[in-house]
């Protein structure tokens, strides 16, 4: 059964809630911030996020607050906040959320039951998509470096999926 909230990191960032695609903020930085929080799966210091996404001449703390308010409208539900922030840290609460790349990665690593040819072909097709397509340059150098490393991980997962497909 599909979960209430789905986040797709493969291809362009997409968020689907209750079967309806959510309208993401127009700001590429806000979308990149959401993608980073979802993909990393851990809390981040506010200062680090400001450094990753905003230049110092701007007001990075205000820009972060603005972006978080826009993102909460996309992913939070009244009974289930997803963007969790305190004075020090920010993270995305992923419990009960389908995240395409995390799901594929976990299924490829699971050794208890072999995946079918159809599943492996489907995963290979998904992994052919560019991870967070269109978000290049949406943050600073640290974000671009992180994005490049994540794309390398996607490529490694694709190779593993194709390897498993070849031995079927």
Per-range role (PLM):
Residues 15, 29-34, 49-50, 64-78, ...:
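DNA major-groove recognition helices of helix-turn-helix
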């Amino acid at each position: 059964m599909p979960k209430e909230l789905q986040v797709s990191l493969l291809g362009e960032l997409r968020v689907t809630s209750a079967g309806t695609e959510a309208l993401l903020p127009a700001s590429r930085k806000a979308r990149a911030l959401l993608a980073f929080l979802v993909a990393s799966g851990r809390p981040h210091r506010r200062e680090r996020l400001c450094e990753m996404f905003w230049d110092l001449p701007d007001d990075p703390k205000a820009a972060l607050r603005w972006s978080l308010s826009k993102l909460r409208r996309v992913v939070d539900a009244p009974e289930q906040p997803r963007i969790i922030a305190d004075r020090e840290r920010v993270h995305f609460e992923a419990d009960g959320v389908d995240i395409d790349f995390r799901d594929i990665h976990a299924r490829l690593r699971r050794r208890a039951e072999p995946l079918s040819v159809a599943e492996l072909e489907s995963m290979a097709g998904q992994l052919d998509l560019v991870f967070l397509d269109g978000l290049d340059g949406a943050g600073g150098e640290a974000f671009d470096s992180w994005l490049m490393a994540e794309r390398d991980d996607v490529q490694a997962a694709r190779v593993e999926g194709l390897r498993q497909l070849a031995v079927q």
